[in-house]
């Protein structure tokens, strides 16, 4: 079966889309830019414009293949799940649980029922491990190191869309950097929702500079 991805928003979203592509390809699916059987819309809600564009991408997918399955993930579905449900999509998933996206799509294809699994992030403290070994159509690799934000700036919805800060395990980041280097990527872009907060939620004593030095020490980078 063919899967088509549409991604709005930041580099973290781009990384997470690449990770979901890998999950589908590992299960034998083909990623396409044409008409597909499954559509994954990775949404953004940082502005009203991005939310509107997210709705437009959903509508476009539904029109492109009325019989296709449409799964909506990301920040917009995390903050406005009821709105997404009313759009008649098949799967609503927020900014957690993406590792199960293939299983959820297969479940929805079989049951034909709408699946909505958006959960509150207030007490979320664990980093969801999503990894890539390749970057689709890119010459440099993005590497997600951190999730969430604790700042709660008056104008910003991101803490509500992404939850509190969660740092990725140091060794996990280094291992992924090594895999990307083996694939020929010489430049790695460390990305996160509030990347400078890396390590503040852990007791390892390791911070962003330690991680930069660790990645810079990977052979080939």
Q: Which role fits each region the language model picked out?
A:
Residues 201:
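Active-site core of PLP-dependent enzymes with the aminotransferase class I/II
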Residues 204-221:
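Alpha-helix-loop-beta-strand connector modules within alpha/beta enzyme cores
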């Amino acid at each position: 079966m063919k899967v088509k991805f549409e991604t709005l928003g930041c580099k973290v979203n781009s990384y997470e889309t690449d990770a979901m592509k890998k999950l589908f390809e590992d299960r034998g699916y083909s990623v396409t830019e044409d008409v597909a059987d499954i559509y994954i819309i990775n949404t953004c809600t940082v502005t009203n414009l991005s939310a509107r564009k997210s709705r437009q991408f959903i509508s476009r997918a539904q029109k492109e293949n009325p019989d296709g399955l449409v799964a909506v993930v990301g920040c917009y579905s995390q903050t406005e799940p009821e709105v997404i449900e009313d759009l008649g999509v098949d799967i609503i998933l927020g900014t957690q649980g993406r590792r199960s996206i293939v299983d959820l799509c297969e479940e929805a294809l079989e049951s034909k029922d709408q699946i909505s699994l958006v959960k509150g992030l207030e007490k979320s403290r664990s980093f969801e491990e999503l990894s890539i070994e390749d970057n689709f159509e890119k010459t440099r690799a993005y590497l997600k190191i951190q999730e969430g934000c604790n700042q709660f700036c008056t104008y910003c919805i991101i803490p509500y869309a992404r939850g509190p800060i969660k740092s990725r395990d140091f060794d996990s980041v280094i291992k992924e950097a090594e895999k990307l280097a083996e694939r020929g990527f010489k430049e790695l872009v460390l990305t996160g929702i509030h990347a400078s907060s890396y390590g503040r939620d852990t007791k390892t004593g390791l911070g962003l500079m330690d991680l930069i030095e660790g990645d810079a020490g990977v052979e080939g980078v």
